[in-house]
């Protein structure tokens, strides 16, 4: 029956700017780029070697409902060495919200893409 999730959408104000951030800053690979009948491109990026892709879709980015306290990330990216990943991304201009936060199960480090979509890195123990 159901086998796997293959796409999720991240709403962006400028597809080219978002593509540059996800490929040149985060190191994702460009996936599919096809025009659609109604105008915007169907544009995806993915972590190297994975089937799961993010659709960079025109829309109202980073506009979730206001919440109290910590806001969950739009998505989480797994890493084996969060300190090295934070250092590398910081050198490419990424600004982390609160640095690396330790939990009993591992570590998280949150940041935002150029459109304000919340992302986080995760390292499990």
Where are these regions (language model features)?
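Conserved active-site tyrosine of GNAT-family acetyltransferases
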Residues: 18-23, 89, 116
